[in-house]
Regions:
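A short alpha-helical cap/connector motif
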Residues: 1-130
Length: 130
């Protein structure tokens, strides 16, 4: 029974994401990534990494699903970066730049983060946010 409920929850999220995308694509409303970007720019927090993360987390928890690592797994990511102290990190997929911020604030000055993003839209938005 738990698996059926979980599957229903996942289907509900999936359907909501499709509807949200179609409505945004039609121009009826903004894409959620545009809304998050606008929040960051409107609140003038571009140079405040923690405030950017807090804004994205708040949006993801209280408004709608975002496909980023989030605050709980983000802490694990940061702890691993501190523990391993890597010289290079390859990030596949940037989306809003959330993980990029978490990674960059934990790298030493000699380390390198290389991020690859297939979507021009996500790339441009992450450049505005990070």
């Amino acid at each position: 029974m738990k698996n059926i409920i979980r599957l229903f929850d996942l289907l509900n999220i999936f359907i909501k994401e499709i509807v949200d995308y179609l409505v945004s694509y039609s121009g009826i409303k903004k894409f959620k990534v545009d809304i998050v970007r606008d929040l960051v720019l409107k609140n003038n927090i571009k140079n405040n990494p923690q405030a950017i993360l807090d804004t994205i987390d708040d949006f993801g928890w209280n408004r709608t699903f975002l496909m980023n690592i989030g605050d709980e797994k983000g802490v694990i990511l940061e702890e691993e970066i501190k523990r391993k102290n890597p010289k290079q990190i390859l990030e596949l997929g940037v989306y809003l730049g959330y993980s990029s911020i978490r990674i960059l604030r934990n790298l030493n000055s000699e380390s390198l983060l290389t991020s690859i993003e297939a979507s021009n839209k996500y790339f441009e938005i992450s450049q505005e946010i990070v």
